Each structure stands twice: as structure tokens, then as C-alpha cells.
């Protein structure tokens, strides 16, 4: 017990010296948090020190492994499984772009396990808007899991699948600033997707998150941040990408001006309250949103389609996503999920 008690101040000292934790140390720390072994004062100091130092890929990977193992899920027996969960936290108040993307990708025939929560950034999280559109957030876990095979998409409401994380809620609420937990959500999907698109709230996180995904064994991923400040690919400025493919991470820049898209400022992508965002999502998935709304979803869906291996390049992915949106197939997929989770 003394040995464990001595460990936490040791880890804090290491972080204050601006030395990153190893993956093993990060696992120890997360286990300590979940088992309520770390004193509150030390926990707060560790979270602040991590944030001040800058989170490393190894710290993210180590903590994510523990949280995934502690979740109520387990891997699905599928060779291809995609998630489009981002970090949120960009503060831009856009409509739920990555949520719309999930239904486009599913309508393309790719199994999707969308992991999400209530709002972390602007006004409306994926769980908020999907609940407003009729998705049962309280469906039984086995029903949620079965939706992947039966519908082609499911939604995992994070608090239902991560009961162990209740242990860390007091630290997060007390600090009222961003912590490593804001980054862990997209990495701990309980159904273990092997391919992901993750938007992050800061450019410097792109290579860090991409490397964390590599350490966690993902087969393919794109991590992105738009220079407009979005955790999505926008229609005004280039987007920085960290691409994980073949076990290697490379960086690229995606310029919307190169792809015959509707170029538009962030203002054109704004959402509102839950009802407004639900209305926008309905229009977009039915193919009747504004040109900017339709195209920002098509662009971000193209990234996911390429990660999934069904689009040879972004241009082809954009065309495929536009066609899916135009015929209302993504809306049909949402209605199928609503019906299945209510049964």
C-alpha cells in the first residue's frame, strides 16, 4: 500500500519535470483513478501537470487501454468497423457534422459504431441531437450491439458503457478546464472499431492523436483539425490531417478549394439549440440542407470512406457521399436505427 501511495507523488514529480509518463505508468495511473487510490489533491495536480506539459501519445494510449478494458463492451467479430467520434471542444457551435457523417458512411455499406456523449464543446452533443431525433439512449447494451449487424450502425451513449469513469467525474468537474479526459473519449469505444476519423480541437494534437491510434493497433485512421479552428474539415481554410495507414503516420493538408466544394465560412455551418440542430441534421440527411451544409458533410464523409477503403481518393469519396445524401439513404438509415432501438 505504501509503495502504491508513493507512486502518485512520483508520477506528479515526473510530470512537473516535463517528462512524459510511459504507457505502463499511464496504465497504472488510470487504474489508480478507477480504483479511487489517488488522493484528490494529487489527482488534480497530475491532471493540471499533464495539461501544462502537453499530453503524449503514450499517455493517451496507456490510459485508453485501461478505460476500454473497464467498459461494458467487447470487440465485435467484424473485419471492418468505423467510428467518427471527435473530441469536441472547438467552441465553434457548428451543427453535428460528424454525427451526420456516421449515417452517410453506414449508408455506403460500412458498419459504424458511433460513440458519443452530450455536449463537450458548443451547445449540442451527438447524444443530445440523436435523442431529439428519436434514438433511444437507454436501450439495452445487447440491443445496441445487435444494431450493428441488423441496421449497419449503432450509437453508444458513453456514460452507459463506461460506468468506471464515474470515479473521475469529481476531478473533471472541480478543475473546470480541459484535461486528458477530453481526448480519451474517441479512443475508448467499447466495441473496438479498427478504423476511425477523429476531429481534434487543436492543431498540435493531430500528430499526437494519430500516434496514439497507432500504438492502440488501429488499422487505419485520419485525425484532423481545420485551420478555421474546427474539429471537422471545414469549407473555408485548409485542414491538417494525420493519416495512419500501413502502421505508419504521415501528415497531409486538405484544401477544400481543390475539390469543387461550396466554399463557405464557419458561420454557414453554425447550429443552434438541440431543436435547431435536429432540424438541420434532418434536412442534411434528407438531401435538402444548404449547399454548405451538404458539402461539409460530404467532405468529412469522404475522409471516412477512404479510411474504410471504399473510396480510392477524396474526390471519389465526396461524389459518393453527395449521392448518398441526395437520395436520402442516410436519413433512411437513421430511421432504421430509431426503430430498431425502440423495439
UniProtKB/Swiss-Prot annotation:
Mg(2+) 1 binds at residues 98, 232. GO terms for biological process: L-tryptophan biosynthetic process. Belongs to the anthranilate phosphoribosyltransferase family. Homodimer. GO terms for molecular function: anthranilate phosphoribosyltransferase activity; magnesium ion binding. This is Anthranilate phosphoribosyltransferase. Its cofactor is Mg(2+).
